[in-house]
Amino acid sequence: MKLGAQYGYWTREPKLDIVSVALEAENLGYDSLWTGESYSSDAFTPLCWVGAHTSKIKLATGIAQLGARTPATLAMQAMTLDTLSGGRFCLGIGVSGPQVIEGWHGQPFGKPIARTKETINIIRKILLRDEPVTADGPNLPLPYPKDAPNSWGLGKPLKLINKPLRPDIPIYLGAEGPKNIALAFEECEGWLPLYYSPSRPEIYQLPHSKVKENFEIAVNVNVNICDNISEGLFMQKAILAFYIGGMGAQKRNFHTELMARMGYESEANNIQSLFLSGKRDEAIHAVPDSFADEI
């Protein structure tokens, strides 16, 4: 088992201690440091800062939102950071949700699984540099079709100018639903589950065969050292209430749906209802201790 440190993203105030955290994690033998993004700090920039001050620890996004960048941009950022860090970068990606992608980035959420598969395919092609990149997927065609709206009709297939340090930069996929989880096992080097319960493997419909050698499951496990169990669970419950209650629309929240599949449907709906009605403290207290402790 490898240990990683999840730094996440900025919340109400910028967190400026990421370098000291990374250095301590590296000195303690941690394998990796992970950043995330929502609609505050981005996932890549903090890793550049960390990479300049460390030498061994892996630098990983967990996750970078697919709707925020084109596949080519993701490939360029991954290649650049991997090269500058001496081959330490891991690209963790995920679809996020329609509320953020359409409300913040102004992009259609569309068919997320198909879009994810096309994105991974394009990134692989770009990094391999076998030939100028083309893609005929319905969601992310390359070049942009000449007959598409607002097209100038001048796009042509291009190939990455420079040779990457590693053409096989590992890709991890953040996934909660069975189809997306299956895609992670089929196309990626690792799976990033947001909530994972080892006692409920049937929830995730994990494959029993054809798993890639060295495939990794990078699970977030929140640790809070304290004397009181209820106090220790409170921080976890606050995070869960935010995601289950507010990180998605009332009609479609992937985190709420996952909690429901884990046997907490009424509790999940109650948390969401309280959170969206402005009763955030009540939403936190509505998260069952058993659920918070399980994951």
Please annotate each region the language model reported.
Residues 1-295:
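Active-site-adjacent structural elements that line small-molecule/cofactor binding pockets in enzymes
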